[in-house]
């Protein structure tokens, strides 16, 4: 029997190990950590016939005792594809695969909708799964959100979940890079701005990874309102382009757009009013169009799509409205982990705004975000590891409003209560513009903490 080594006991690693075991592989898991929680997980996996080696770093020496019958090494998205150990293993003929690749092997007979982009992909994934399910189809979402692709494959393979009509998969650049075989029935590209450059090295490399997914997709859908995608349009000889800016954005024809009267339409007919989706912001009109194009491709009628859009509850941590504080609308936008996403969130809410931002800063162009701050923010409250860096950026840009700093989110919320009242703000917005890893497991944990902190302060309904 050949052996597969899975690296890492995160959600993707766990899913991959169980999926491979379900397929009768001899599976060993390497995990560099060793704590009580990992020991508990290790014991559970051992009972399932999966061996775990804790305290095992990703080095060539770690593999020495396991080379006999080694068929493949499977990694999760948190491990760089070009890690020196993986590069060396590949040069020695060892197959290195991403967790997403193992799931594709198991699930490729089911049509995939693969959704990628710097920003917008989570909202599109949630919204599209909702629309398809509301029309009576089985269309679970997973990948970069919710269940990992391998976990979904396990549940479908075991019969715990019914065989889906569609799989709605959010795909990050890390996942795409390590799964070059994934070829969706429908591919969606939401936006492209500089992100994860510390991992991919350049915008060109980052773009090429995402482009590969769309090139392999049977049907490719693009957001024509995105400046980078629009600039690359002439390099595509196929695809459906959507625009919230009318029929001819930048003098290029759109295939699906919102007209001057607020109607979603294509080249032959008006479909429905764009205001069926209650979520604020121009970016959500773009999301609506991408979802509509995909749903039409999947065989839904305009009426089915419109009915489903009316009932969409929104996405947790993405401009999620939590209530009001001293009359100001409170938004949890913890998913805004870079400057571009934070700029989009700030554009979407009513000013004057009290903004909470901070965390682990990323490379990127902050100019658009800073411009929105100058225009709409009455108070900027910075917290976490990146507070000093963000404060320097704001001062250098000439931000004219109140600027406060504190060590963590709890202090920021306390300051925000006073700032809302002091400035008679219309909105209070957590939109960090940073990753969460300085103080939180992920952006969801940060958003949940914000919800816990702000709930006691909210006005009574």
Swiss-Prot record:
InterPro entries: Folylpolyglutamate_synth_CS (IPR018109), Mur-like_cat_sf (IPR036565), Mur_ligase_C_dom_sf (IPR036615), Mur_ligase_cen (IPR013221), MurD (IPR005762). It catalyses: UDP-N-acetyl-alpha-D-muramoyl-L-alanine + D-glutamate + ATP = UDP-N-acetyl-alpha-D-muramoyl-L-alanyl-D-glutamate + ADP + phosphate + H(+). GO terms for cellular component: cytoplasm. It comes from the Bacteria. One of its GO terms (molecular function) is ATP binding. ATP binds at residues 117-123. Its EC number is 6.3.2.9. It is an enzyme of class 6 (ligase). Keywords: ATP-binding, Cell cycle, Cell division, Cell shape, Cell wall biogenesis/degradation, Cytoplasm, Ligase, Nucleotide-binding, Peptidoglycan synthesis. Coiled coil: none annotated. Its main location: cytoplasm. GO terms for biological process: cell division; cell wall organization; peptidoglycan biosynthetic process; regulation of cell shape. Pathway: Cell wall biogenesis; peptidoglycan biosynthesis. It is found in: Cytoplasm. Belongs to the MurCDEF family. Cell wall formation. Catalyzes the addition of glutamate to the nucleotide precursor UDP-N-acetylmuramoyl-L-alanine (UMA). This is UDP-N-acetylmuramoylalanine--D-glutamate ligase. It comes from Synechococcus sp. (strain CC9605).
């Amino acid at each position: 029997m050949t052996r597969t080594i899975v690296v890492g006991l995160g959600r993707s690693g766990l899913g991959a190990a169980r999926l491979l075991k379900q397929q009768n592989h001899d599976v060993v898991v390497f995990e560099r950590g060793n704590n009580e929680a990992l020991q508990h997980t290790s014991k559970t996996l051992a009972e399932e016939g999966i061996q775990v080696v804790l305290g095992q770093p990703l080095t060539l020496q770690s593999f020495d005792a396991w080379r006999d019958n080694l068929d493949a090494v499977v990694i999760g998205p948190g491990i760089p594809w070009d890690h020196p150990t993986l590069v060396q293993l590949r040069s020695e003929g060892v197959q290195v695969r991403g967790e997403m690749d193992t799931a594709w092997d198991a699930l490729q007979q089911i049509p995939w909708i693969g959704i990628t982009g710097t920003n917008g992909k989570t909202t599109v994934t949630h919204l599209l799964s909702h629309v398809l399910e509301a029309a009576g189809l089985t269309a679970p979402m997973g990948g970069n959100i919710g269940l990992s692709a391998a976990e979904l494959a396990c549940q479908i393979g075991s019969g715990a979940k019914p065989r889906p009509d569609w799989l709605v998969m959010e795909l990050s650049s890390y996942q795409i890079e390590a799964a070059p075989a994934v070829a969706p029935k429908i591919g969606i590209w939401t936006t492209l701005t500089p992100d994860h450059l510390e991992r991919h090295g350049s915008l060109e490399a980052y773009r090429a990874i995402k482009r590969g997914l769309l090139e392999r997709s049977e049907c490719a859908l693009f957001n024509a309102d995105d400046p980078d995608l629009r600039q690359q349009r002439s390099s595509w000889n196929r695809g459906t382009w959507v625009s919230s800016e009318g029929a001819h954005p930048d003098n290029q024809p759109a295939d699906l757009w919102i007209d001057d009267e607020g109607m979603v339409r294509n080249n032959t007919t008006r479909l429905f009013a764009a205001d069926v989706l209650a979520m604020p912001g121009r970016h959500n009109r773009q999301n609506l169009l991408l979802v509509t194009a995909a749903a039409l491709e999947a065989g839904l009628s305009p009426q089915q799509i419109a009915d489903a859009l009316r009932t969409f509850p929104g996405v947790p941590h993405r401009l999620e409205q939590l209530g009001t504080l001293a009359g100001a609308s409170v938004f949890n936008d913890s998913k805004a982990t870079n400057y571009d996403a934070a700029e989009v969130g700030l554009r979407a809410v009513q000013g004057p705004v009290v903004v909470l931002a901070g965390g682990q800063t990323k490379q990127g162009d902050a100019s658009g975000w800073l411009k929105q701050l100058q225009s709409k923010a009455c108070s900027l409250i910075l917290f976490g590891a990146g507070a000093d860096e963000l404060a320097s950026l704001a001062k250098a840009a000439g931000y004219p409003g109140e600027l406060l700093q504190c060590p963590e989110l709890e202090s920021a919320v306390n300051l925000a209560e006073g700032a809302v009242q002091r400035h008679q703000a219309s909105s209070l917005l957590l939109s960090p513009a940073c990753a969460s890893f300085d103080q939180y497991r992920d952006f969801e944990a940060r958003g949940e903490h914000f919800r816990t902190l702000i709930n006691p302060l909210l006005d009574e309904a």
